[in-house]
């Protein structure tokens, strides 16, 4: 499950690096807490991924500046908990996961309280301006804006349940 989440999220993040400035170390301190995934897109087909809904994601800053991301997602009718550790690099806003196999970036959005990352904002309400900013960033890197997925927000989803 971790590679699947990383394939979905991290490929997007890495592809969007050039659109915005990377978040500084000071800004990274603000990402700890609850975030809501507002939209996502990928650069390849993932037939095994049938994301129906996602609960709010919790980001926690760990010792040494690493980040832990946790969320529960309804995938193909089953709730599955996903946890990923993002390891800080020397470059502000840049992280690696899965022993360096994946590179992740936390990128500043033009919208307040939004980042281009796993999730887009701290509240569950969609912000059309933030979505437009996300679409521009995705389009600038050659990702199809037509394949952007906006998952249904759900408050709870227990692993193993449907």
Curated annotation (Swiss-Prot):
Pfam family membership, one: Lipocalin
Domain of life according to the entry: Eukaryota
InterPro entries found in the cross-reference section: Calycin (IPR012674), Lipocalin (IPR002345), Lipocln_cytosolic_FA-bd_dom (IPR000566), von_Ebner_gland (IPR002450)
Signal peptide (UniProt feature, chain positions): 1-18
Main location: secreted
Keywords per UniProt: Secreted, Signal
Family of this protein: Belongs to the calycin superfamily. Lipocalin family.
Protein name per its UniProtKB record: Putative lipocalin 1-like protein 1
The organism of origin for this protein: Homo sapiens
Lineage, opening ranks: Eukaryota, Metazoa, Chordata, Craniata, Vertebrata
């Amino acid at each position: 499950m971790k590679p699947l989440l990383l394939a979905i999220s991290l490929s997007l993040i890495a592809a969007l690096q050039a659109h915005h400035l990377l978040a500084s170390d000071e800004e990274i301190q603000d990402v700890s807490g609850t975030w809501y995934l507002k939209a996502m897109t990928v650069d390849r087909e993932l037939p095994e991924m049938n994301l129906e809904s996602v609960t709010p994601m919790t980001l926690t800053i760990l010792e040494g500046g690493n980040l832990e991301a946790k969320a529960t997602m309804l995938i193909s009718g089953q709730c599955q908990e996903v946890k990923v550790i993002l390891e800080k690099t020397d470059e502000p806003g840049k992280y690696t996961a899965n022993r360096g196999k994946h590179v992740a970036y936390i990128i500043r959005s033009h919208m307040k309280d939004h980042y281009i990352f796993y999730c887009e904002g701290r509240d569950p309400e969609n912000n059309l301006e933030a979505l437009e900013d996300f679409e521009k960033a995705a389009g600038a890197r050659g990702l199809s804006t037509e394949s952007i997925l906006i998952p249904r927000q759900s408050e709870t989803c227990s692993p193993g349940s449907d």
